[in-house]
Structures are given as structure tokens and as C-alpha cells.
Amino acid sequence: MNCEHFGICGGCTNIQDYSTQLQAKHNLTLQEFQSFLDTKSKNFQYPTNPLAIEVFASPQEGFRARAEFRFSHVFQNKSGLDFAMNAFGYNHRVPIKKCPILLPTLQDIMPLLLHYLNTYDLLNHKLYACNLLSSLQNEIIITLIYHKSLDSHWESLALKIQKELEYTLNTNIHIIGRSKNHKHILSNDIICEHLTLFANTPKERTYTFFKQESRFCQPNPFINTQMLEFIVSALSSIYTPQTPCDMLELYCGSGNFTIPLASIFRHIFATEVVKSAITLLQKNMAKNNIENIIPARLNAFESIQALRKERVFFRLKNIDLDAFAFDCVLIDPPRSGVGEEEVLYFLQNFNTIIYVSCNPHTLLNDLRILSQSHYVMRFGLFDQFPHTYHRECIVILRKSNKIL
């Protein structure tokens, strides 16, 4: 990657050439998960022997849809403030003027935004951080975070800058100001993302997702598309319209996986503990004209209690849990993984498990239990964050049939 800050800025920690990075990630993943892929010593019927890890590469530049920058007055000079990132290998910040891993529209806005921040003291006074969020359709949210209260004078100036940026870049820009316990939204805090799956094939379909400031969303839309295609293709080979059944999703968020999978299942019972994420999921359902997703505000343990009828939840009073015929479960846990044996043993009740992991080490631990009842049907390695050592994995597991 051609970046003047490569090896200096700590945003990118892997400075090898991209093909070497990807091969190293593949080799390490293969080494760690070999026992789950090599079936020679297993007493189960498997489709292939051994199973290959499917590797999905990212664009090397211009792939990241969000960024978090800091500012420090230490870097003030005659040309003004710069964005700042943590230094590579050191506990201090370094100034940067550009970031090639960002989507092109975010790269374009960085120098323009810096110009305005350096021009107006009202904008840069006690400015602490800046978050950027974009869609592939070039709509942008700029969040400016301050150690001061923001008044009507700030709002008037920020609105003026917002309009000038929109005119210059010919796209929708939304500036948000944040200070302690306050959020100033000048126009909107939600943008639209259109993702097309299986482009230029008979299966091509486009979905619309709302992305909200401060809410989690997939940072690499190119890899996200490949992740969705991977899961949809795997499940489409298992489930057909002639075999209608339902899916349970734990940690569904705002529906990144839920929305595209709705066409495969009769119903999806989508559970999530964050109330605002469920609200966004409902917006995504309406936008995509989907009616067979049933959201519920439950954590993983509450979901298990509800489905086992161990506890009655008032918030589920209008949902008939007995009407579901679950065959598949999708779980996208935090970096800490599932961990809890009670949840893992509960997952073993489903014929199909889709496990989305952002931490191979916790995935490895969880598979030690899940592999007692299921085999790995497909294993995908997704390079969500090029130029880092991060690895994203998706494992499709099917219930095993012992050979008698």
C-alpha cells in the first residue's frame, strides 16, 4: 500500500506486502483449526476430507467505511491542526494528513474538513476527536467531539460548513456535534447503504441498510458483501422452499445478517439486547419490505430461558414461541466469544449453526464443545482489516451423523 504514514501510524500494524499478509493469516488459521478440518480420525460422516479454508481478500486500499481520529494541540504549527493516530509501536500520537485505507469519499473530505477546522476557532476550540462514517453511495456523517458545551453559534457555523462540503463534494453530508451528555444533530444521524449480493448473476439482489452514528456497523463493505454471500449460499444449499423452517439469531444487531437471510426461512426470531439496535433493525425491515423477522430485546441467556419456558417475559407477550420450528441458529458474539457452556450446549440443539467470529482464539475454544455434536461444513476466513493481524471467520456447522 502506498501510504506516507505506513510504519509510523499505528492504524496499520502489519507492514508486509498484502499477499504475504493474507498467506500468513491463512497458514495460521489452518494450523489452529486443522483438527476440526481434518476428519480422518473422526467417527462422523463428512462431505469432504479434509475441508479447505475459503479465503476472502479485501481491496488493499479504499475499503474502510469508518474512522476515529484524535486531535492534539501538540501538533499545531503554522499550517494548523492535523488529524492524529496512535504511533506504530509507541504510546504517543502522530499527525497524519491522509489515510488511504478509507473509502475514497472519506479521503476526499479529510483535507477539506481540516481546512475549515483550522479556519474557525469556534470549530477547533477544545476539539477532542472526529469520527467519520460513510456509505458506498458517498453519504457521510462527521461527528466532532468536544470538551466544551456547544451553543447556537457553533450550530450555525457547523451548518454553514455542512452545506459548503455538500456543494464541494456533491453528496449528502451530516455534521453532528458531541459534548458531555449532549448530541447536536444538524440534519440526520442515519445514512443509507445499498449492498448488492451476487452481482451480475441470476441471484443478484440489492438490500438497503440504515447505518447510524455511534451504532456498530460492518467497517469493510466489500468484505461484508462476501460474508453475506458466503452465508446465503451455504444456507441456500441446505434449506429450500420445500423445507420451511425457522432460524434463531443471537446478537442480531441492526440486522446485517438477518435481512438477507429472511428470504431463506419461514421466520427469523432475532434477539438483541441493545434497544436502539432493534429500532434500527425494524427500520431496515420496513425499508426492505420484510415481514417475517420477529425482533425481541433479549440477551443470549434470556433467549434460552424464554425458549425453554423457564421464564416468562412481558416483552414477549405478543410472540407465540410455540409457533417456531427452529432448525438453524446464527450467533455473532463479541470478541470474548460465547464462552458459557450453557449457551454452547444450547446451540447443539440446532441442526445448523452459523458462528460469526471476530476472534479466532475464542472461536477455537467454543468449537471444542460444538464439535462434539457438529462438523464444520464450511470455514471462511475474511480479511476484514488488511494491514493488521486481525482475522474474521465464519464457520457453518451441521449436526453430525455417526457411522454405525
From Swiss-Prot:
One of its GO terms (molecular function) is tRNA binding. Signal peptide: none annotated. The active site is at C358 (nucleophile), E392 (proton acceptor). S-adenosyl-L-methionine binds at Q218, Y251, N256, E272, D332. SUPFAM superfamilies: S-adenosyl-L-methionine-dependent methyltransferases. Belongs to the class I-like SAM-binding methyltransferase superfamily. RNA M5U methyltransferase family. TrmA subfamily. HAMAP family: RNA_methyltr_TrmA. This is tRNA/tmRNA (uracil-C(5))-methyltransferase.
